[in-house]
UniProtKB/Swiss-Prot annotation:
InterPro entries: aa-tRNA-synth_II (IPR006195), aa-tRNA-synth_II/BPL/LPL (IPR045864), Anticodon-bd (IPR004154), Anticodon-bd_dom_sf (IPR036621), His-tRNA-ligase (IPR015807), HisRS-like_core (IPR041715), HisRS/HisZ (IPR004516), HisRS_anticodon (IPR033656). It catalyses: tRNA(His) + L-histidine + ATP = L-histidyl-tRNA(His) + AMP + diphosphate + H(+). This is Histidine--tRNA ligase. GO terms for cellular component: cytoplasm. It comes from Streptococcus pyogenes serotype M49 (strain NZ131). Its EC number is 6.1.1.21. It comes from the Bacteria.
């Protein structure tokens, strides 16, 4: 058997990992500006944490979850999304306690798992960046969180991003709309896809979310959920729209957007961008005011979003965005002869401890091959160290571009490499 990675997974090699690290660092910096702190939850949870919160009838639970019984006969699932585990942690760790400053703002970056057909930007193990804000029902929380995602896209240079907005209203509004949708779709049941016929019985709002051609045709003239919002829900949605306009964040109302998870209420949103003629969702989220209570905590409003790192990086690449990744090395040591081996290690380690990136040859290659490595690493400075240099206690360091060089004692290298670097690179 040829040993390979499982279908739908990937190896992220150093060249690509640098791009991932850059995007993650921009996200962390952005979230910290909004007073978010990082949370890390287990990669696997008890099955009920996901099934009950995400919804027993959702595609995630019925088709996509990786679940199994462990050796203690516990029903376990690999996390398919980030919100439910964070809410579970919020309740379990009593972050609702009065001594904890509200709202509680948390972000996460990590692997998620769904069994689905692998395709561009969609894998069975994928990586998600997400945020969750607990404790504020104020519509300004909705808008601030949406604005934070918008701010992140601006920082990354992503273009042509459109905010799609909708409201699912209160549970009462949603129930009234659910019945209206059933009444509308039932006469055309036979025209729906098999999946949507099932959804009509279990979760009719999900028919609106279908990508099947026959379903899209069926819901074209479906009633709008916005016509079923109660007074409080209407006021919340109007406030969200007003504040988005105040922040100059353009949006479009999309009444067919319902999101794929059952726990949302009031504001839901997606950021969509066009890539090679296709519309791709880059980020999505919304409000969930009942989820904390569902996990046994006090009734606590919540709002959050998630975005897929693979898809985000694919969009960055397709839009031709060059990420400012530092790839240069400060110094490369070419080593000649066994007599220089120990001193080379001593010098390169001393240089690193002064805050510089450094590498040396370990393979005993010819000098030409070592210089080629220095070029590959984009080394700014190159030093050649042989047995004669070790005996003299000094060596020549040269600027790898200008070829300017200077002879430097080992003592200076080990204690004041910053001055040497500045002298050669200025």
């Amino acid at each position: 058997m040829k040993l390979q990675k499982p279908k739908g997974t990937q190896d992220i090699l150093p060249g690509d990992a640098a791009k991932w690290q850059y995007v993650e660092s921009v996200a962390r910096d952005t979230f910290s500006q909004y007073n978010y702190g990082e949370i890390r939850t287990p990669m696997f949870e008890h099955y009920e944490v996901i099934s009950r919160s995400v919804g027993d009838t959702t595609d995630i639970v019925t088709k996509e979850m990786y679940d199994f019984y462990d050796k203690g006969d516990r029903h376990i699932t690999l996390r398919p999304e980030g919100t439910a585990p964070v809410v579970r942690s919020y309740v379990e760790n009593k972050l609702f306690a009065p001594e904890v400053q509200k709202p509680v703002k948390l972000y996460y970056i990590g692997s998620m798992f769904r069994y689905e057909r692998p395709q561009a930007g969609r894998l069975r193990e994928f990586h998600q960046i997400g945020v969750e804000c607990f404790g504020a029902a104020n519509p300004a929380t909705d808008v601030e969180t949406i604005a934070m995602a918008y701010h992140l896209f601006e920082k990354l240079g992503i273009k042509d991003v459109t905010l799609h907005l909708n409201s699912l209203g209160s549970p009462e509004s949603r129930a009234a709309y659910r019945q209206a949708l059933i009444d509308y779709l039932t006469p055309m049941r036979d025209q729906l896809s098999k999946d949507s016929q099932r959804r009509l019985d279990e979760n009719p709002l999900r028919v609106l979310d279908s990508k099947e051609k026959e379903d899209k045709l069926a819901v074209e003239k479906a009633p709008s959920i916005l016509d079923y919002l109660d007074e409080e829900s209407q006021a919340h949605f109007e406030a969200v729209k007003d504040m988005l306009e105040a922040l100059d964040i353009p949006y479009v109302i999309d009444t067919n957007m319902v999101r794929g998870l059952d726990y949302y209420n009031h504001t839901i949103f997606e950021f969509i961008t066009s890539v090679e003629g296709s519309d791709l969702t880059i980020c999505a989220g919304g409000r969930y005011d009942s989820l904390v209570g569902y996990f046994g905590g006090p009734e606590t409003p919540g709002f959050g979003f998630g975005l897929g790192l693979e898809r985000l990086l694919m969009i960055i690449e397709k839009q031709g965005i060059t990420l400012p990744i530092e790839t240069e090395m400060d110094v490369y040591l070419a080593v000649l002869g066994d007599g220089a081996n120990s001193k080379a290690l001593e010098l390169v380690q001393a240089i690193r401890r002064q805050g510089f990136t450094a590498e040396r040859d370990y393979l005993g290659r010819k000098i030409k091959a070592q210089f080629k490595s220095a070029d590959t690493f984009k080394a700014k400075l190159v030093m050649t160290l042989g047995e004669s240099e070790v005996e003299a206690g000094k060596a020549v360091i040269k600027n790898n571009r200008s070829r300017q060089e200077v002879e430097v004692s080992f003592e200076d290298m080990m204690t004041n490499f910053a001055n040497i670097s500045e002298q050669l690179l200025s």
